[in-house]
Each structure stands twice: as C-alpha cells, then as structure tokens.
C-alpha cells in the first residue's frame, strides 16, 4: 500500500485513537511513520526502496536504496528515540558512506562512533521528500 491515508482508513481506528494518544496509537504510529516514509521515497523522490534483514532475522533496516554507487540504509522512528541498534549493526557490517535516520528529531549530520566510517544523517520525518 502506497498511501498513508489508505493505511489509516483500512486500520479502522477512530480519529480519537490518534488524538488521545492511546496504547493502540503507540503501537500503530511506527507503521504509520514507515508507510509515510515509503510513500515519500517512491512518490516524491523517485526512489524504489527495499528492505534488509540479517541472516538471523534479529536485525532489520526499514529501507535501503541505491544512490549512484552507494547503498543507503534508512531507519524510521516515530518519536525522538535515536536508538537504532539495527542501523548501527548494518553500518558496522557494510560500512555505507551515508546512513539515514528519519525521526521527529531535528536535522543533524555526524560520524558514527566505534570507528565506523559512516556519516549518520538525522532527517526529520517532515523533510523525507528532500532525501534525493
């Protein structure tokens, strides 16, 4: 499904679930944020995102896409939570030049710790359409 509105409608949740910040919304907002990012990547950026998980299926990256000769991992969080263990594991294993963390945080750009040769770009959810 490529439309965040359709996802919301198909969920059958009432608007009060969103405005009251109920437990159901806390569970649903991650899927909603991921759907929004996928919609923006495809419709606004012309990017065909893919999914990655490691062999043990314990780590996953929400989206990966190719940009020139680079594969760019994208992790999506619906809050200001900056813990992205799977993204760190992916970067440690594959050493991409750039990794993107989409969340409710402000813009930031910083090298990853632990000697990982990757620049982490924090991109606010509202700015995902600027990814390309």
Predicted regions, residues:
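A cross-kingdom feature that marks ATP-driven nucleic-acid transaction machinery
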Residues: 1-132
């Amino acid at each position: 499904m490529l439309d965040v509105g359709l996802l919301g409608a198909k969920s059958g949740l009432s608007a009060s679930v969103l405005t009251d910040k109920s437990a159901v919304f806390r569970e649903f907002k991650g899927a909603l944020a991921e759907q929004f990012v996928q919609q923006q990547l495809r419709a606004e950026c012309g990017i065909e995102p893919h999914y990655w998980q490691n062999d043990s299926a314990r780590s996953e990256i929400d989206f990966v896409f190719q940009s020139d000769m680079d594969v760019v991992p994208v992790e999506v969080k619906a809050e200001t939570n900056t813990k992205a263990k799977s993204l760190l594991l992916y970067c440690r294993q594959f050493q991409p030049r750039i990794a993107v963390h989409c969340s409710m945080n402000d813009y930031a750009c910083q090298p990853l710790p632990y000697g990982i040769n990757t620049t982490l770009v924090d991109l606010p959810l509202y700015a995902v359409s600027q990814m390309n």
